[in-house]
Structure formats: C-alpha cells, structure tokens
C-alpha cells in the first residue's frame, strides 16, 4: 500500500480528527496507522506538516532533518506531537490506500479543461474523475508515470512521476502537487478511474 499526506482546498491544518477520517474516505483511502506511517518513513517519506493518525495522535515523518521541521541537528524519525482534542485541534492527515480495483489513466483529450469539463469528460469515457488515493496507488503500486498535470476529484491538480527526469520532478519519484487552481480555468488535463 501507500501512505500519502492530505489537506483540503481550505489549506493546511484545517481538519479535526473526524474530518480527517472522512477526508481519507473521500479519497478512496483510510486514515493511516502509526505502523503504516513508520513503514512509509522507512521507505523515504519526508513531510514537514503534522497529520492525524488512526490512534488520534498527530505526527510527521522526517528523513532529512532541517530547520523548520524540528531542527537541523535532530535525528531522522517520525516526530510525535502527542494526542490532541479530536474535535477542536486541526491538522492535516495521513491516509493509506492499498486497494486498486480498476484502471487509472490520463484522458487523451484535444483541449485543456475546466474542472467541470474534466468531470464530464471522464463520465463521457465511461469512467469517473480520479481521486487522490487512486493517483497515489497507481503511482506506488503500478509505477504509473505521466508528466501531465491533471484535475482530480477534490479539485486539486497533480501528476505522478515514477521515473524522475528533467522538467518532470528531476530530484525524486513523487506525485507532484500543482495546487487547487480556480476551477474555471482551462489549463489542465484530467485523470480518470474506471472501476
């Protein structure tokens, strides 16, 4: 499976524990356990924003210690913020997905699309616009690689790179995050998922 950090369009540190659980479900994933995050950290996951885990703790994985992420002179590891109020405290979340039942693909389309056009284009192709969990699963489990930014269901734009190269995530294999653009701008393609 694969662990991925998640935050919504609202921006970082906006989810209480219950919203964090739901955010993962909405992306075809579940909230990650500590063991899953630890395994991901051992596999190289480095993320400088704290996120909820399934036990209600708030942690983040650091493989490259640096000043804003707990300090330069600290050892690599999973940093633990401890347990926080599940209703009032707000953080990001770490999600986990391992199920991959279907086909994930970049839709070949003659023009770039707005978000609404992207949703419709996948439907017209007998599919649905892909979720964040699906792009991470395709990238990690299938080695999916595409240097085209595409809309996803949550309104974010991302692209998966498993073979780093110039102009396409040159330093590391990653699902690159472009942002949450204005949904009315026709600047992107779309990733679809057919179950």
What are these regions (language model features)?
Residues 30-31, 94-96, 128-129, 191-193:
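Beta-strand cores of modular interaction/reader domains in eukaryotic scaffold and signaling proteins
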Residues 36-75, 79-85, 133-182:
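An exposed tryptophan-centered "aromatic clamp" motif
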Residues 60, 91-94, 159, 188:
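Tyrosine-centered aromatic motifs in long, intrinsically disordered, low-complexity repeat arrays
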């Amino acid at each position: 499976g694969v662990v991925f950090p998640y935050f919504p369009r609202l921006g970082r540190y906006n989810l209480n524990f219950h919203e964090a659980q739901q955010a993962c479900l909405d992306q075809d994933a579940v909230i990650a356990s500590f063991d899953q995050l630890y395994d991901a950290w051992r596999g190289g996951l480095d993320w400088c924003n704290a996120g909820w885990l399934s036990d209600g703790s708030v942690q983040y994985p650091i493989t490259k210690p640096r000043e804003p992420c707990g300090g330069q002179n600290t050892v690599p590891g999973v940093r633990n913020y401890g347990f926080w109020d599940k209703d009032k405290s707000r953080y990001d979340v770490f999600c986990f997905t391992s199920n991959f039942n279907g086909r994930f693909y970049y839709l070949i389309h003659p023009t770039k699309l707005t978000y609404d056009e992207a949703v419709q284009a996948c439907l017209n192709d007998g599919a649905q616009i892909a979720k964040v969990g699906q792009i991470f699963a395709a990238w990690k489990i299938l080695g999916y690689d595409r240097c085209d930014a595409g809309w996803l269901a949550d309104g974010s734009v991302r692209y998966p790179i498993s073979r780093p190269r110039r102009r396409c995530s040159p330093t590391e294999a990653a699902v690159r995050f472009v942002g949450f653009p204005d949904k009315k701008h026709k600047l992107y393609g779309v990733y679809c998922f057919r179950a």
